[in-house]
Amino acid sequence: MIVLDYALRFPEGLGGIIVTALPMGAVGVSPLKLVLGHILSRIWPTFSLNTGIDQSTGSRDPAVVAANIQDPLRHTRGTARLATEFQATSAWLQTHAHALEVPFFSLHGDADRVARPQGSRNFFERVTTPDKEYREFVGGYHDLYNDINHSEVTAYLCDWLERHLESSWHSKASRI
């Protein structure tokens, strides 16, 4: 969401953007917790609670899941203010998706339970730039770059980058 927010507000100089598992629409946090976060954000913005997101929903690779669980920098807590800002940013992005002017590549796993793929699909449909591409990976979980099909994901990513870096290079060279 951060890269989209930036690209919509400051598109100058960007050659394109790539997003994976865009958290638009339904996410793996219960609606009750999101409403509670919104209410508490006004009076106790630093209040935090467990989001309830299951750490095994990131990847189908057991080694990756185990490493994520052991990583002291990964956690499943969120603050009340995070919930409020997340929802506000998501709504703003949906409203302004049509204004995205740079090449756009969105990737999502169709089995993602953290950020449901329908949200990515809906956002993609609102984007009007002619240079846009959406790729959904069958069985893919939330963390596509660390899922069992990461080679397939990386191949699509490299192909998109090669096509866009080449066209960007030719565009700049023609101006010289």
Task: Report residues per predicted region.
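Short beta-strand/loop motif that positions the catalytic acidic residue
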Residues: L100, S106-H108, D112
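Active-site nucleophile elbow and catalytic-triad environment of alpha/beta-hydrolase enzymes
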Residues: G78-H96
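Conserved hydrolase catalytic core segment
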Residues: M1-V19, G25
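Catalytic active-site module of serine/aspartate enzymes centered on a nucleophile-bearing elbow/loop
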Residues: E133-I176
